[in-house]
Amino acid sequence: NSITDSLFIGKNASGISIDKNSKIWILSKGDVPSSQAPKLICINPITVSIEKSISFAGGQTPWRLCINKTKDTLFYLNNGVYNFPISQSSLSSSPIISQGSKLYYGLGYNPNDNTIYVSDAIDYVQKSKIEIYTPDGTFIKSVNAGIISNSFIFD
């Protein structure tokens, strides 16, 4: 095995998804000490080039990138749940799901029923609460889970 090509995308990549056009989306948390802003980056895997690089405002810490079933809308955590249709060129300033006083720690998209799963770690000691929402952010229900639940796998 050998490296055939590379591309600098910034520091602290925290999520990766592939869209309906086979483009690679990477969420980079950035790096405060070196003044690198967090970014959402779209890479063309054929040309190995960055097609979109969208910076987040200072002080933001986006993470937990996932994509919907039709692979045309990304979701991520950033003190709330945000969506990003891949056809857009700018980030939304408002979350579809507000975090409030909760401690969102995990995010997933269930392609079987098109629902968003968000884990509230509460205080890192109690059992987490999993909240389930529609893609537009309408609350459906919540269920209890283990301590600091952070990932979701759907068959």
Question: Where are the regions that the model predicts?
Answer:
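Repeated scaffold domains used in trafficking and secretory/extracellular systems
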Residues: K11-D19, G59-K69, S101-Y109, A145-D155
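A short beta-strand motif characteristic of beta-propeller blades
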Residues: S2-F8, S49-A57, S90-G100, G137-V143
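A short loop-to-beta-strand structural motif that recurs across blades of beta-propeller domains
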Residues: P38-I41, G80-Y82, S128-E131
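C-terminal hydrophobic structural anchor segments
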Residues: S90-A121
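Conserved beta-propeller blade signature
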Residues: K23-I26, D72-Y76, N114-V118
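Short, solvent-exposed loop/turn segments at conserved positions within beta-propeller repeat blades
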Residues: D31-P38, D123-K127
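Blade-level signature of beta-propeller repeat domains, shared across WD40, Kelch, NHL, RCC1
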Residues: K129-D155
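Structural recognition of the beta-propeller blade-terminating site
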Residues: N44, P85-Q88, Y133-T134
